């Protein structure tokens, strides 16, 4: 039996192999597209937030709002920088693999990619969650703690931060999808190990 549960015989071995290669290639192309999207979206998010500055004059005193004033935004910029760099490296790996016609990897490499994708996905989720909570306080305030609505004073700053968080959210969703693909790839390695001990990813 093959690892798809199909009976192996001289008549269907070549057909099933060709079909699996086709599926693998489609998965890798999808992975490449997602990694490129994550790289672009994460980079856009980091740039939008890192370059966001607004100066207001209050009682003859200039007050400047910048992303470093909120630690959650600093975290989001760092996380998106990591996600963009990591996605770029992995996208290059995907391109090289597709150009060489190799879509299968060794188990250690597959596990390394899996753990890397999981780590970056969790970082993205944590960064977006922290930034969204801080943005909510800035937008709505907290009367019980006497926290004022910062966005009433720094509208442009808040709007640009919102755009950055939205871009980071889409990058986060893309990273979660990529981590699912890498998880599928890793666990599929062991699906055929019993019936095809000589095959390697």
From Swiss-Prot:
Bilayer topology annotation: Multi-pass membrane protein
Q: Where in the cell is it found?
A: Cell membrane
Chief localization: membrane
Highest taxon of source = Eukaryota
Checking Pfam families in the record gives:
CASP_dom
The alphabetized UniProt keywords are: Cell membrane, Membrane, Transmembrane, Transmembrane helix
Instruction: Reply yes or no: does the keyword Oxidoreductase apply.
Output: no
Quaternary context: Homodimer and heterodimers.
| Family the entry assigns | Belongs to the Casparian strip membrane proteins (CASP) family.
Q: What is this protein called?
A: CASP-like protein 2B2
* Organism (species): Arabidopsis thaliana (Mouse-ear cress)
